Swiss-Prot record:
Top-level EC class as recorded in UniProt: translocase
Stored CDD domains: Cyt_c_Oxidase_III
Organism of this sequence: Rickettsia conorii (strain ATCC VR-613 / Malish 7)
Enzyme Commission number(s): 7.1.1.9
Pfam assignment, any one: COX3
Protein name: Probable cytochrome c oxidase subunit 3
Bilayer disposition of the protein: Multi-pass membrane protein
Localization: Cell membrane
Gene: ctaE
């Protein structure tokens, strides 16, 4: 089956298939090196090595630039070159679903560590694992009140899940104004959540190095917070694309927004588990 593809409204090519043959791209290799630089910078920062802040900053900037350029090319493939045919979109959807599946496993490890530590509180004593009074959380840890800031953050994320769904329905109804408004509200809620989380960390009564409880807490909630920031950036991109009119309802021409919504709902669900087990059960 052949398909005509218009390039920049000036000329067209005809493909003999609907599948996407990926063009040569420098971004996978460059992103790998940028991530390596980021890891080196992070390790240097944690150990206080010389020039650590410069290496870390270079890593963050490099990763950000590579991802921006890579995703820009993907958007160009879909909008300008019209290479995102039905099988290509299906492949991208499957890829996003598999990515979220790996994220579920990723957070599952943190929950497994938390439950192992909480249900069987043990510690190292002269190289031997011994039961530590059977108390969880440890007596030296002053936990957060779950129905204070954590509960407010729960309401914020639940409301943001509602607004991103509103944006999706508005897009399906070809209501660009409501779609843009709902996306803006979702972004503001995401920023508000991150601000509240930072406030909570700032006033925490324990540090990352204060035992297994603190390590589990900061790893689980910290990585979730990082995912909220990434999801917020994802939605900001969708906001500007929606204002520009990039998204359409014909042929699922809003796959980028759909993937962002999936990711955001995943972040919501993870937080519900964190709130239930880490904050309520853990306190």
């Amino acid at each position: 089956m052949s398909q005509k593809i218009i390039l920049n409204n000036s000329y067209s090519i005809t493909k003999s298939h609907l599948f996407h043959i990926v063009d040569p791209s420098p971004w996978p290799v460059l992103t790998s090196f940028a991530l390596l630089l980021l890891v080196i910078g992070g390790v240097s920062f944690m150990h206080g090595y010389k020039f650590n802040i410069y290496i870390l900053s270079a890593g963050i900037i490099s990763v950000g630039y590579c991802l921006y350029s890579w995703w820009r090319d993907i958007v160009k493939e879909g909008i300008v070159e019209h290479q995102h045919t039905s099988p290509v979109r299906k492949g991208l959807q499957i890829g996003m679903a598999l990515f979220i599946l790996t994220e579920i496993v990723f957070f599952g490890v943190f929950f497994a560590s938390f439950f192992k530590s909480s249900l069987s509180p043990v510690g190292l004593l002269d190289g031997v694992w011994v039961v530590k009074q059977g108390i969880w959380p440890p007596p030296t840890i002053k936990t957060f009140e779950p129905f204070d800031i954590p509960f407010i953050n729960t309401l914020i994320l639940l409301l943001s899940g509602t607004t991103v769904t509103w944006a999706h329905y508005a897009l399906e109804e070809k209501n660009q104004k409501d779609c843009v408004t709902a996306l803006a509200l979702t972004i503001l809620l995401g920023i508000f959540f991150t601000t509240m989380q930072a406030y909570e960390y700032y006033h925490a009564a324990f540090k990352f190095t204060d035992g297994i409880y603190a390590s589990n807490f900061y790893l689980a909630t910290g990585f979730h917070g990082a995912h909220v920031i990434i999801g917020t950036i994802f939605l900001i991109i969708c906001y500007f694309r929606a204002k520009r009119g990039d998204f359409t309802t014909e042929g699922n021409g809003h796959l980028g927004f759909e993937c962002a919504a999936w990711y955001w709902h995943f972040v919501d669900v993870v937080w519900l588990f964190l709130f239930t087990f880490v904050y309520i059960f853990g306190s």
